C-alpha cells in the first residue's frame, strides 16, 4: 500500500511505515495529480484541496485529514468517485479550549474585567464549544449556548438564539463548521447585521473558520467601537490575511489554536486508525508528543500557571511582526503542551 502524507503532520513517520509498503512525504500545497496518481491513500491537512482536479484518474481509495474541519475535501466528488474519507473530530478540542482560556485571562487582565460579572455566548457547541463552556463555567461566567442543529434535535431548553447572545454577551466565541449554503449555513454568519445588533461591546473570538466572520464587517465593528476587542486565529483568504485587521485585533495568530502537541498527536493517531480500519490492517503503534522543556511550573496562582504553560501573545507578536510568514509560522509551530504535561508548584 502506498500513502502520500503531508510532511507537516507530526509523530507519524515510524507509525505510518508500519502500515504502508511505501510512504511519501510532501508539503500539503504541493500535492499534485501526478504525485497522488498511484497512491492508495492520502493523509492531509487543510492546505490540500481534495477535488476532481487532484483525484480524477488516481488509485486513491481513502483520504484521512488530520483536522476537525473537512471543507477542503470535495465530499460530493469523493462520493461519486467511490473515495471514502475521514476527519479527526475533537482531536484538538482541548488545545482550542487552552487557547481561549489563556486569551480570556489576558483580556480580562488588560480590560479589568471580573469573570463572575461576564456573560459568554458560545456559538457552536460540539467537541470544542463544550470544552470552552466548561472553561467559562470554571471562571464563574454566565454561559449562553447557541447550536441550531443540536437545538433542533434536543430542544431549546439548553440553547438560546443568536439575537439573545447579541443582546446579552460580553464575550462571543465561534466554534462552528463552515457551511457555505443550506439550512445551517455559517458562511459570514457574523456579518454587518450581526455586528450592528450587538449591545454590550463584546470581545469577539474566532477559532473556527475564517469565513464564518465577514472581514470587512469585523473591521467596521472594531473601527466604530461596536466591539471592544477581537481575538482572531482563523482568517478569510489564508495565508493572504488582511493586514489591517491583524494590526487592530488584540490577539491575532496563524491558525494555531488547535496546534498543541497533544492535539496534533491525537489527529495523527485518528488518521492512522481510520486508514487501518478502512484497509483492514492490524498495526500497533504509539503516538506520543515530546515532554515540555520545563515540565515543572512555579506560580503563585492558577492563572499565572496557565499563562506560563501557554501565552498566545507570543504567537500574536510573531505574526504581527511578520504577517508574510503566516504559512511558515503555522507549519513550523513550536512545541506546545497542554496542562496534563505539567506539574505546578507554589500555589497556596
UniProtKB/Swiss-Prot annotation:
It is found in: Cytoplasm. SUPFAM superfamilies: Formate/glycerate dehydrogenase catalytic domain-like (SSF52283), NAD(P)-binding Rossmann-fold domains (SSF51735). Keywords: Cytoplasm, NAD, Oxidoreductase, Pyridoxine biosynthesis. Substrate binds at residues 46, 67, 259. Pathway: Cofactor biosynthesis; pyridoxine 5'-phosphate biosynthesis; pyridoxine 5'-phosphate from D-erythrose 4-phosphate: step 2/5. The keyword Hydrolase does not apply. InterPro entries: D-isomer_2-hydroxyacid_DH, D-isomer_2_OHA_DH_cat_dom, D-isomer_DH_CS, D-isomer_DH_NAD-bd, Erythronate-4-P_DHase, NAD(P)-bd_dom_sf, PdxB_dimer_sf. GO terms for cellular component: cytoplasm. The active site is at residues 209, 238, 255. The keyword NAD applies. Its EC number is 1.1.1.290. GO terms for biological process: pyridoxine biosynthetic process. It holds the Pfam family 2-Hacid_dh. It comes from the Bacteria. Homodimer. Catalyzes the oxidation of erythronate-4-phosphate to 3-hydroxy-2-oxo-4-phosphonooxybutanoate. PANTHER family: 2-HYDROXYACID DEHYDROGENASE-RELATED (PTHR10996), GLYOXYLATE_HYDROXYPYRUVATE REDUCTASE B (PTHR10996:SF283). This is Erythronate-4-phosphate dehydrogenase. It comes from Bacteroides thetaiotaomicron (strain ATCC 29148 / DSM 2079 / JCM 5827 / CCUG 10774 / NCTC 10582 / VPI-5482 / E50).
Amino acid at each position: 500500500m502506498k500513502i502520500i502524507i503531508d510532511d507537516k503532520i507530526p509523530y507519524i513517520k515510524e507509525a505510518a511505515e508500519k502500515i504502508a509498503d511505501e510512504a511519501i512525504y510532501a508539503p500539503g500545497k504541493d500535492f499534485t495529480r501526478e504525485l497522488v496518481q498511484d497512491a492508495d491513500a492520502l493523509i492531509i491537512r487543510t492546505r490540500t484541496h481534495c477535488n476532481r482536479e487532484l483525484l480524477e484518474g488516481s488509485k486513491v481509495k481513502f483520504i484521512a485529514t488530520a483536522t476537525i474541519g473537512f471543507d477542503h475535501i470535495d465530499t460530493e466528488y469523493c462520493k461519486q468517485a467511490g473515495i471514502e474519507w475521514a476527519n479527526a473530530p475533537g482531536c484538538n478540542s482541548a488545545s482550542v479550549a487552552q487557547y481561549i482560556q489563556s486569551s480570556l485571562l489576558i483580556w480580562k487582565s488588560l480590560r479589568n474585567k471580573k469573570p463572575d460579572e461576564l456573560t459568554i455566548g458560545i456559538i457552536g457547541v460540539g467537541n470544542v464549544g463544550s470544552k470552552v463552556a466548561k472553561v467559562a463555567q470554571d471562571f464563574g461566567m454566565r454561559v449562553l449556548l447557541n447550536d441550531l442543529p443540536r437545538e433542533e434535535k434536543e430542544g431549546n431548553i439548553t440553547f438560546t438564539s443568536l439575537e439573545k447572545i447579541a443582546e446579552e454577551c460580553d464575550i462571543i466565541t465561534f466554534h462552528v463548521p463552515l457551511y457555505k449554503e443550506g439550512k445551517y449555513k455559517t458562511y459570514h454568519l457574523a456579518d454587518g447585521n450581526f455586528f450592528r445588533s450587538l449591545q454590550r461591546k463584546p470581545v469577539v473570538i474566532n477559532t473556527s473558520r475564517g469565513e464564518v466572520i465577514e472581514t470587512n464587517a469585523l473591521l467596521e465593528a472594531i473601527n466604530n467601537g461596536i466591539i471592544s476587542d477581537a481575538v482572531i486565529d482563523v482568517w478569510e483568504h489564508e495565508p493572504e490575511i488582511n493586514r489591517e485587521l491583524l494590526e487592530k485585533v488584540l490577539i491575532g495568530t496563524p491558525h494555531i489554536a488547535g496546534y498543541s502537541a497533544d492535539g496534533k498527536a491525537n489527529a495523527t493517531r485518528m488518521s492512522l486508525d481510520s486508514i487501518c480500519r478502512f484497509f483492514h490492517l492490524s498495526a500497533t503503534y504509539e503516538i506520543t508528543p515530546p515532554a515540555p522543556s520545563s515540565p515543572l511550573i512555579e506560580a503563585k496562582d492558577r492563572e499565572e500557571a496557565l499563562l506560563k504553560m501557554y501565552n498566545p501573545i507570543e504567537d500574536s507578536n510573531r505574526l504581527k511582526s511578520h504577517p508574510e510568514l503566516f504559512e511558515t509560522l503555522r507549519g513550523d509551530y513550536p512545541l506546545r503542551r497542554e496542562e496534563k504535561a505539567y506539574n505546578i508548584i507554589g500555589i497556596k
